[in-house]
């Protein structure tokens, strides 16, 4: 079969700062998926995109081409509107876990396709696999059955959704092109648009523990994704939220499930509850639902917990089985008295990863009980010798490297010193 273009033509055009035509973009994504464009050629194009950018039309067409490489899901058979939420990830970010059943309890359908963790950011599926018997991989029919029974499902995305993105993501990871905003936006949105929900709410994290540490970059990414959703006919909005400090009081798989259960029981850390409610209200508003019972009340009265337990059971999970507990633990204590001024999310995340809560490469087996409990947050008054963190691992040998990662992770100042942290919500962006 003769090809319409050559890889060198496409690379040269973007290298020389020309716009790529719709036809060039369609061919490029399709040819790479078919193996006509070699990895080294696509690497050169990705670097040219990183350096020279893409305009909104190019990003939109690139996203459409990735969607077209696979299947597009439909939820038209459901009797309620569908809405999804996507977070760019961070440390202690367990918000999806209480959020999906909460929004379902308030009347929307939530097909939540989630991922696994890599590096210092935790993955939703890894956390849920702390629950005995819980199944991450479902067929489309199984997904539909769970969502019809429970109103929500949290599971892995099937291989048929945007397969071009899977291939490109692996290449970006090893070519220094992960940070290109056009490529990040199209990677996320190709999968989310292919999911077929009528609305999408984005939680774009910023701060030391986030993928986008600069708030300006995070806002640009959020605006780019909201625009892509709008162009695709998906009602899309975004919150840019803080990840300079870990979310909640835990970082690690089973530890975060415990915290989720506290939130669903009407308790839990105030920042986790606040962000869960903010996102729940955004999701319900995005699909035009005015619930009879508010999200805040649905957390307190057990409605959200009921959906959670049904959802876990429907996916094979044992709600009453004990959660994994690490074999060993050590405490990190305050070396002075005063006010806790900072708690660095990145350092906490790296430490949890070294304890066994995260993986260095895909497929690595996790220690589901490993991670960190947080006993004080910025603004808290602490005394010398007071516990700040508890580190959990199955292997004593992991503690030294985990402690090394925590050097400078928190600072203690005078009781009148100002704390140094971002507001929980920095910006709201709507299409």
Model-flagged regions — what are they?
Residues 127-153, 223-229, 233:
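A glycine-rich helix N-cap at a beta->alpha junction
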Residues 81-104, 108-120:
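Glycine/serine-rich anion-binding loops at beta->alpha junctions
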Residues 113, 147, 155-157, 203-207, ...:
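Short beta-strand segments
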Residues 46-50, 127, 165-174, 203-212, ...:
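Active-site-proximal beta-alpha loop/turn segments in soluble metabolic enzymes
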Residues 51, 98-111, 191-196, 231-232, ...:
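Alpha-helix C-terminal capping segments
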Residues 1-92, 310-314, 425-431:
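Acidic, glycine/proline-rich low-complexity segments that act as flexible tails and inter-domain linkers
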Residues 5, 9, 14, 19-22, ...:
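Well-ordered secondary-structure scaffolds
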Residues 148-197:
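Phosphate/diphosphate-binding glycine-rich loops and adjacent basic-rich segments that engage nucleotide
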């Amino acid at each position: 079969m003769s090809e319409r273009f050559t890889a060198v033509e496409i690379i040269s055009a973007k290298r020389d700062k020309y716009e790529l035509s719709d036809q060039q973009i369609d061919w490029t994504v399709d040819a790479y998926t078919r193996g006509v464009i070699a990895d080294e050629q696509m690497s050169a194009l990705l670097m040219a995109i990183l350096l020279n950018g893409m305009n909104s039309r190019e990003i939109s067409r690139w996203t459409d081409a990735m969607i077209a490489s696979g299947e597009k899901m439909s939820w038209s058979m459901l009797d309620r509107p569908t809405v999804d939420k996507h977070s760019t990830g961070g440390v202690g970010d367990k918000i999806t876990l209480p959020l999906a059943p909460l929004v379902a309890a308030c009347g929307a359908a939530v097909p939540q396709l989630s991922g696994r963790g890599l590096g210092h950011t935790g993955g939703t599926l890894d956390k849920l696999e702390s629950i005995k018997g819980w199944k991450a991989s479902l067929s489309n029919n199984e997904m539909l059955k769970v969502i019809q029974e429970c109103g929500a499902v949290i599971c892995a995305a099937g291989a048929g959704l945007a397969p071009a993105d899977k291939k490109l993501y692996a290449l970006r990871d090893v070519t220094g092109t992960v940070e290109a905003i056009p490529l990040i936006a199209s990677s996320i949105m190709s999968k989310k648009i292919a999911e077929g929900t009528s609305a999408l709410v984005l939680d774009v994290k910023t701060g030391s523990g986030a993928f986008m540490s600069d708030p300006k970059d995070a806002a640009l990414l959020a605006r780019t994704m909201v625009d892509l959703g709008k162009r695709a006919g998906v009602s899309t909005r975004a919150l840019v939220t803080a990840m300079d400090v870990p979310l909640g009081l835990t970082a690690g798989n089973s530890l975060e499930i415990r915290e989720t259960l506290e939130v669903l029981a009407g308790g839990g850390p105030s920042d986790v509850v606040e962000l869960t409610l903010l996102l729940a209200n955004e999701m319900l508003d995005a699909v035009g639902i005015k619930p009879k019972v508010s999200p805040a009340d649905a957390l307190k009265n057990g409605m959200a917990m009921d959906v959670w337990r049904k959802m876990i059971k429907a996916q094979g999970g044992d709600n009453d089985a004990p959660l994994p507990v690490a074999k060993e633990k050590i405490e990190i204590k305050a070396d002075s008295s005063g006010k806790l001024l900072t708690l660095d999310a990145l350092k906490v995340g790296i430490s949890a990863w070294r304890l066994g809560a995260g993986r260095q490469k895909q497929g690595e087996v996790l220690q589901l009980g490993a991670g960190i409990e947080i006993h004080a947050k910025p603004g808290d008054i602490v005394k010398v010798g007071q516990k700040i963190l508890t580190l959990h691992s199955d292997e004593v040998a992991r503690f030294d490297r985990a402690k090394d990662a925590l050097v400078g992770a928190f600072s203690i100042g005078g009781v009148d010193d100002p704390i140094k942290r971002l507001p929980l919500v920095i910006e709201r962006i709507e299409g």
